[in-house]
Structures are given as structure tokens and as C-alpha cells.
Amino acid sequence: MRALFSAITLLVLPWSHAATQAAEPVALPAVVIYAPSPCLACIDWADHLRQNGFTVTMEEKLQADMPKIKRWLNVPSALESVHTAKVGRYFLEGHVPAQDVLLLLQEKPIARGLAVPGLPRGAPGRESYNPICDTACTILDNGGQAKDIRREAFNTMLVGPDGRTSVYARH
């Protein structure tokens, strides 16, 4: 009986170890967000990333320093938003959904990064109206004319190594 138990253990043990290995979560690279202070929508986007498993650090920058950061990370000027982030070897510009970032890290395309240009309402961090934030954020958002929340369709753009863009995800 003891021999039978040992034989079964030897057969099952490698499989149980493999199952345990597969169940272990993969560590995500940390996200560093560079944002002007105060930007409540940027803070909400950071919370969205945290809720999806990312470790996030926010570095408050002067508005005047943001263009230098965007140039350093090779963000095309036509795709700029308020905040800029770095995850692994990629930049994230604007309110990029966490599921797009996760897919980027899984697929590992040869690219500079992802961008959601402007400030589309309904994007992560832009789900609700905040009059305090809109004072700064509406520069790119129709001057804050609409107080009611409206969800806007938006695309996440993949920026290739040469700066060319393609639609990575539609929301």
C-alpha cells in the first residue's frame, strides 16, 4: 500500500507543482506618472491602474516641465494629453485603460508606447464630472461647456518606433 501511495505521489506531484506555478501572478512593472499638480483626473487614472494590479508612483511636475518629459519619452506632439507615464520600456500618454496597458505588456510590440489623445470623457479617470479638475483639464475639453457626463468614444493609439500610429483599441 505504501508503495502504491509513493507511486501515485511521484506521478501527481510534478503536475501539482506545474499547476501551482501557473497560478502564481506575474509581477507587473511599476508605472511612473508625471503630472502637473493638481490634476484630479490624473490621480483618478492612477487609482484605476492600482485597481488593476499596477504599482503606481506619481511625480508632480510644473506644467512648464511637461513638454520636456514628453520629448524625453518621444511622445508625438499630436497625441499629447495632460499627464505622461512610463511603464517598462513604453510611454503611456493620457487616460489609457489598464486593459490596454496589460495587453501591451503581454504582446510586447516594438513600439514607443500607447496614447489616448486629449481628455475623452468616459476614459479611466474621466468617468465623472469634477468642476475643480475641469478648471485645468478643460483646456483640451471644449472649455468645460457641458456639466452633464457624456461618454465619448475614443481610441487608444499604438505609437511605433518611427512615430507612426495605429488604432490599438477602440472604446
Regions found by a protein language model. Give the residues of each.
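Bacterial N-terminal signal peptides
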Residues: R2-S16
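Boundary at the C-terminal end of the N-terminal hydrophobic targeting segment
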Residues: S16-P25
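Local sequence-structure signature of Cys/Sec-based thiol-disulfide redox active-site neighborhoods
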Residues: E24-N52
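Loop/turn elements at helix/coil->beta-strand transitions in domains of secreted/extracellular proteins
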Residues: L28-A30, F54-T55, E80, I110-R112
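Ser/Thr- (and often Asn-) enriched beta-sheet segments in non-cytosolic proteins
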Residues: V32, T55-T57, N155
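Active-site-proximal beta-strand/loop segments in catalytic clefts of secreted hydrolases
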Residues: Y34-P36, E59-K61, H95, P117-L119
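N-terminal, post-signal-peptide region of Sec/Tat-exported proteins
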Residues: A41-R89
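Thiol/selenol-based redox catalytic cores and closely related redox-interacting motifs
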Residues: K70-H171
